[in-house]
Amino acid sequence: MVVDREGIAPTAADWQRHVLDLEGRPAPAGYDAGPLLALAQRRHAELQRAIDARDWFDPWIYPNDEEESPSEAVLPWVAGFAAAQDLFPALMSMNAPDLVEPLALVYLHFDPEDLEDADALAAVIETIEPPADLAEAVQDLVRAMMLIADVTRPRRVAPQPQRRPGPRKPPRRR
């Protein structure tokens, strides 16, 4: 989950209601959403750990056929990311120039006509070469998430342990 610089992130209760329905409407009567929500929570934790450690994660991308372009294959993932940004706009309201490139790597998969009020983003997208294949498209998405994390939750530099002075050498005898 992407957070802003103050560490504010949607809680599980905030985002879980959108797992079954984008608008957050309740599940139909009699439907037990528990197992699906448990899986979503588990995946969230996996992604959280990977992004926090800046490790590779495998986005769930399912190409439909060999004729499909890389952008068409990743579009459901990108659309989910965009929907999350609409629901939880803290990331998009940050004024951080370092976010433009990673957001462009994600949003370049949309039709340029769909990027309303995103002139700076559209300008950067025009300079990016589209991915040559699905592997490159997936790599760009993961890279974009890591770059976003670098801005929204920078790694804390671990304090260096202080070195203890070693044993003193005895004075030289004459």
Model-derived regions, located:
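Acidic/negatively charged segments and metal-coordination signatures
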Residues: 1-75, 82, 86-174
